[in-house]
Amino acid sequence: MTQYLDPVALWEDLHQIPELAMQEVKTAAYVAKTLQDLGIETQTQLGGTTGVMGIIRGSEPGPVVMLRADMDALPFTIDGKPCAIHACGHDSHTAMLLAVASRMKDQVKKGTLKLLFQPAEEAISGALAMIDAGVLEDVDYALSSHIRPIQDVEAGKVCPGVMHSASHTMFVEIEGRSAHAARPHLGVNTIDVACAIIQNVQAQWFNPADVWSAKCTQLHADAAVSYTHLRAHETG
C-alpha cells in the first residue's frame, strides 16, 4: 500500500524554517530532498534562483499540467529584531503540494504533471524569474491556490476568472520646507502632504465590481517634535 505524505507533518517542518524572498535555501533543499525521496524527477536552482520543480511523466502523450506553490516568508520585526515569519501561509502551500506529489507520483498515465515551487512571491520577482526560466513554455494548464482563513473549509471556493489582482509597489519621496511647529505657515509639512495623498488615493472612484486595492503601507518621517517635517517617504 502506498504511503502518502502527511501535509500537517510537512507544514510543521516548513513552518520552522521561514526564509525571505530569494533566500529560501533551506526550504528549497527540503522540497528537493522530499521530491527525490519520492523518486520524482527534480530540477533545482531554476533560473539561477531557489526555485524547484518536480516532474511526473506519464507513459502516454497528453496535456502538460502545472501545479504551483510559493515558498517565501514575510519580514517582521519582533522585540526590535528583524526576522522572517510564515504569516501568509506559503509554508502550507508548499506542504500541500508536496503531499499532492506523494499521491500523484504513480497516478499520471497520460501527459505530464509539473510541480513548481516558486520563490519570492512576496517580492514579485519570483514569478518573473520562473517565467524567464521557461517553466510555462510547454504548459497547457497551470493551477495554483492560496489559503483563506476567512473561507469555510467545507465550502471552498473556485473562481473561473480573476480572484486576486496583481500587485505593484510604489515608493514616493516628498520634500517640503522645515519650520517651527508654532509657525507652520513658514514651512511645508510633509506629513500634511503625505496625508493628503493617502486620502486622495482612497477617494478614487473605481468601479466597485473591479478587483482593485490601493493602500499606503509605510510612512516614514524624521524630525524633532517641535518642527515640521522636511522629508517623508511613503510606500504602497
Residue ranges and their predicted role:
Residues 52-55, 74-87, 91-92, 107-226:
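Histidine/acidic-residue-rich, glycine-tolerant segments that coordinate divalent metal ions
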Residues 229-236:
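Single conserved hydrophobic/aromatic residue that forms the stacking wall/gate
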Residues 1-87, 91-110:
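Acidic/His- and Gly-rich active-site-bordering loop/insert found
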Residues 11-15, 174, 229:
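General secondary-structure edge motif
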Residues 71, 135, 232:
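Hydrophobic pocket-lining residues within nucleotide cofactor-binding pockets
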Residues 19, 24, 121-122, 234:
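Acidic-residue sensor for enzyme active/binding pockets
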